[in-house]
Regions:
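Conserved, well-structured ligand/cofactor-binding cores
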Residues: 1-240, 244
């Protein structure tokens, strides 16, 4: 079945996903952190493929340029798939592949959709699978989001502690089972809020350490099948460079 594409950087795979999975109305475009992370993964993959001689330098260069434009906040309106979809993020991965491929084609002077020149799967997704691209991008985006959340929570911890000091002289009744129980100070209550919040910050720090482990190069089922020798090491090294602030 043929599909009429609107004027857009995404392609037919994205359009079909939009038609097949209109589930929540919450779109990939609503999560810029994830889009940026996907573009960083695509850049790292292109660099690795170029280093191994698998991707023509001319094509690789424009793929990287297009991916960097996305990282700088451009073209996000073309990431239109629903966040809830069939598969393991395949539609999200293809949305990224098509946007980057079509923008790269424009940079080469070709019309969008000239996939005989530069293809979303054959070039942008070279040596990759949704099953390593998507979880890696999600982890990068989550790591950054957690960092921002921790900053906000740390500020709240500080505010609770200050109130704990300010309210130290003020007595109140502690309550259990919806009844007055024994006395405490209002300062103790706010200090307890601070302690509980700090424990949550510490748990988030532990979670950040766990999600720094990525599976780029493992491809579809974790064995690295279809990825050439040396690719996994190359793409992980490039990914580390692009996410150095997370180290």
């Amino acid at each position: 079945q043929t599909c009429a594409l609107p004027i857009s950087l995404y392609g037919v795979q994205t359009l079909r996903a939009m038609e097949n999975f209109p589930i929540t109305g919450v779109l990939l475009a609503d999560f810029p952190e994830l889009i940026i992370a996907l573009a960083q993964v695509k850049e790292a993959a292109a660099q690795a493929n170029m280093a191994l001689g698998l991707l023509d330098a001319k094509l690789g260069t424009v793929i990287i340029r297009a991916a960097r434009e996305v990282q700088h906040g451009r073209h996000h309106e073309h990431f239109r798939v629903d966040m809830i979809q069939g598969g393991a993020g395949t539609s999200t991965n293809m949305n990224a592949n098509e946007v980057i491929a079509n923008r790269a084609l424009e940079l080469l002077g070709y019309a969008r959709g000239s996939y005989d020149v530069l293809h979303p799967n054959e070039h942008v997704n070279l040596s990759q699978s949704t099953n390593d691209v998507y979880p890696t991008a999600v982890k990068i985006a989550l790591h950054r989001a957690i960092a921002s959340l921790k900053d906000a929570m740390a500020a709240l911890v500080g505010a609770f502690l200050r109130k704990g000091d300010a309210f130290a002289p003020h007595l109140k009744m502690g309550r259990t089972q919806l009844q007055d129980a024994v006395p405490m100070t209002l300062g103790q209550e706010f200090s307890a809020f601070a302690h509980t919040m700090q424990e949550d910050v510490d748990r988030l720090t532990e979670a950040q350490a766990l999600i720094r482990e990525i599976n780029m190069g493992a491809t579809a089922i974790g064995t690295g099948i279809t990825a050439p020798a040396g690719y996994a090491e190359q793409v992980r090294a490039r990914s580390e460079e692009h996410t150095s602030e997370l180290q």
